[in-house]
């Protein structure tokens, strides 16, 4: 179930998809404090539902290991959608193996961040990605 953000933000709109409630809370709090509008979901199918809908996102943060569909499956589907092909995607995961990283980039990820992560560094990476797009 998506937790909708309450207001529009000039910094952009981000979708957070992670099955761990405490990680979602940390990310939502961090991003809202940085003036982003944030929606969050706990599984792959919910992420796909929002991404396939009419709402536009400026960036998507995806965990790899989620129920229903992995973050990599969501990324693969996202890149097939005509109206969402260019949405930047950051994979945020505890799976830091080279094979996972390679697969994510081969599917079109813009960045790959391993958990645990530095909130300051994550925000800097998000800003960098949004500035280049």
Question: What do these predicted regions represent?
Answer:
Residues 1-15, 120-133:
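Non-catalytic signal-transmission and effector/linker regions of two-component phosphorelay proteins
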Residues 40-59:
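Acidic, metal-coordinating helix/loop segments flanking the phosphotransfer/catalytic sites
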């Amino acid at each position: 179930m998506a937790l909708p953000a309450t207001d529009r933000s000039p910094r952009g709109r981000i979708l957070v998809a992670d099955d761990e409630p405490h990680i979602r809370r940390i990310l939502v709090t961090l991003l809202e404090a940085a003036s982003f509008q944030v929606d969050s979901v706990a599984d792959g199918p919910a992420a796909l539902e929002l991404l396939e809908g009419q709402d536009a996102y400026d960036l998507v943060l995806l965990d790899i290991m989620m129920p229903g569909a992995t973050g990599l499956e969501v990324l693969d589907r996202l890149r097939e959608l005509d109206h969402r092909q260019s949405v930047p995607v950051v994979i945020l995961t505890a799976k830091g193996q080279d094979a996972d990283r390679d697969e994510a980039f081969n599917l079109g990820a813009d960045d790959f961040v391993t958990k645990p992560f530095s909130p300051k560094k994550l925000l800097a990476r998000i800003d960098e990605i949004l500035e280049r797009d």
